[in-house]
């Protein structure tokens, strides 16, 4: 009888965590997710999984070592996927101490918990690292041997997490791996991230619910992939014979401007760009008559970071060769369309619900319904 695979996922309520939970459940795993206690219900992405016999949730926090030790001791996982993080680069400038506690020391708390409960030789650990480590890049594209030059408090914290994983692998022989994730998006992406901000704005503008989209540096270059494809690579990393670190990327690069151009195209709006830098604007040249000639995208200095990483481009050669992973399962164009289609439906649904509420309020005021 084969041993039951037991996965513990931190950050299970996030974009990656929810997709990874689905993948592992489909592979027959017992999946245990770690969630934080909160007065706000943030479990929308995993609501469809709750109630399944092999899906379990536990309360713990990366800032609380005792809670982490308790969960690891109770679950006794064969694999841990540490996806929890303060993952907003901009927020890390506003909350650097919190970012360091979660993204740096939080990683240490997890691997120490594994050692303390006696699972160092039986539990494999995946750490979600980031392309932001490359920061002020010294070469393109970036691979596993490219020097790091972190350019934000978030990246600095993540660099500690990266190196402590390598240290425990070397010092204690633990199966610990870093996945250096380049930007990966989906219809489950948080609405404050630039890609989701763009697709939601395009949908709202197309449906008459928003006038304009404000963005930061349109020239920023990113390697964008589909999160659903990337979680497969996370799993493959822990199935390898030896623990190693891998770049997870598509190997294809696009600008923020290109992402916006394509998103608006998919809602039936064509943009023409005029001006440069902070004075650049996206003007509608084709689409609904009431929008033609209007400026729909503007650059705002408010969205520029104190230090900005402008050229991230990953080389997934190692993951492709050693793991057999296909980084181009979903193309850039397909990714943007998936997100736009989802947000067009979401905005339409929200608009319909708002109309019902307005009509009900009007009927109540007139005494039509009581």
Residue locations for each model-derived region?
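N-terminal Rossmann-like NAD(P)+-binding domain of SDR-like oxidoreductases, especially those catalyzing
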Residues: 1-184, 228, 234, 238, ...
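C-terminal substrate-binding subdomain of Rossmann-fold SDR/epimerase-dehydratase oxidoreductases
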Residues: 26, 33-34, 60, 189-370
